[in-house]
Amino acid sequence: MIAVPGYGLVYGYSWLDWTMFAILYVVTGLGITVGYHRLLTHRSFECPDWVKGCLLVAGGWALQNSGAKWTADHLRHHAHCDDPADPYNAKRGFWYSHCGWLLDPVPCNDERFGSRVMQDRV
């Protein structure tokens, strides 16, 4: 995330490049926070299928896995917060909880934690 604007400052981006960067930053952020997190994981609200589809596509653009996998991992995190079964256990350090856990081969029980999302037709 830091390297992309840094590269642009050194080598120069057009206004279109900077605009697309800003728009996609916001759109993918909304896809993850509103779509994957609030809608799929916590079921905070209901929306038409086309809105859900748009949020899932935007979340997919963030390259943080599918909505079903992301939700399963996050529900597992809530079920086992800061214990050894927590996929992004903060007790293992900032870098591990932020991105290192993705490299850990410990499998997530997607069938248990992601079954509700897998049954959604969207």
Identify the residue ranges that each predicted region occupies.
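Non-catalytic, topology-defining segments of multipass membrane proteins
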Residues: 1-122
